[in-house]
């Protein structure tokens, strides 16, 4: 079965239906949909960010993905051990707040980056991390929402995205099966069947 629902000993098959992001069909029989992730690679330099958009288009990406948060919307400013990075990374000893201040994509850049991506034939959407980010993305008329796997248990955030009736892409990398099921169910309860799961 492509998608299994166990009812007693019976397995039902639900074939995935096609959906579209900015008019580009995604699903069985369609070309692979390639998303270029900007993340923090802009290094707080807008011109570098624009260069990344152009590089993504030249490489054949169908979409550019941003991340929409600020240090204050994703964590608190604290130097307590729980808020310090450890474990042998490049950022050991730094606070989470400090890291996110360096890594975030300024919100005033995002409409301009979206416009640049669209000029080059790419869709542009983002990962929100709190309700204000969803509201901002709606103002920009972004065509889809990508939920980071660390946020898959944030059911209120997922419901807010689902209520826009736009495609919701759920990353599942660090999620348990039950968490994935709860996220999918939340979308469906909001009447949104446009759900994509990423391994």
Protein language model features and the residues they cover:
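Active-site mouth loops of central-metabolism enzymes
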Residues: 34-48, 99-103, 123-127
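Active-site beta->alpha loop and helix N-cap motifs at the rims of alpha/beta catalytic domains
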Residues: 89-150
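Catalytic alpha/beta core domains of metabolic enzymes, predominantly
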Residues: 177-199
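Glycine-rich, proline-tolerant flexible connector loops at the mouths of alpha/beta enzymes
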Residues: 63-102
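Active-site-adjacent beta->alpha loops and helix N-cap segments on the catalytic face
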Residues: 147-165, 176-183
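N-terminal amphipathic alpha-helix/helix-capping segment at the start of soluble metabolic enzymes
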Residues: 16-35
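Glycine-enriched alpha-helix->loop->beta-strand junction motifs that scaffold or abut catalytic
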Residues: 138-145, 163-168, 188-194
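Hydrophobic faces of well-ordered beta-strands that scaffold small-molecule active sites
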Residues: 34-36, 64-66, 124-126, 145-147, ...
């Amino acid at each position: 079965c492509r998608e299994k629902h166990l009812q007693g000993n019976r397995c039902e098959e639900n074939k995935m239906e096609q959906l579209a992001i900015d008019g580009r069909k995604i699903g069985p029989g369609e070309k692979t949909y390639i998303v270029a992730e900007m993340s923090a690679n802009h290094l707080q330099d807008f011109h570098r960010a624009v260069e990344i958009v152009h590089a993504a288009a030249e490489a054949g990406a169908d979409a550019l993905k941003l991340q929409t948060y600020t240090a204050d919307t994703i964590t608190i400013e604290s130097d307590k051990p729980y808020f310090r990075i450890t474990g042998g990374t490049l950022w050991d000893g730094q606070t989470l707040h400090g890291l996110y201040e360096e890594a975030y994509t300024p919100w005033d850049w995002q409409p301009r980056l979206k416009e640049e991506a669209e000029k080059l034939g790419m869709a542009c959407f983002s990962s929100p991390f709190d309700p204000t980010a969803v509201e901002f993305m709606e103002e920009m008329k972004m065509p889809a929402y990508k939920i980071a796997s660390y946020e898959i248990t944030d059911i209120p955030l997922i419901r807010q995205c689902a209520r826009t009736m736009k495609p919701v892409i759920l990353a599942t990398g660090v999620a348990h099966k039950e968490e994935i099921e709860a996220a999918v169910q939340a979308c469906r309860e909001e009447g949104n069947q446009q759900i994509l799961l990423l391994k």
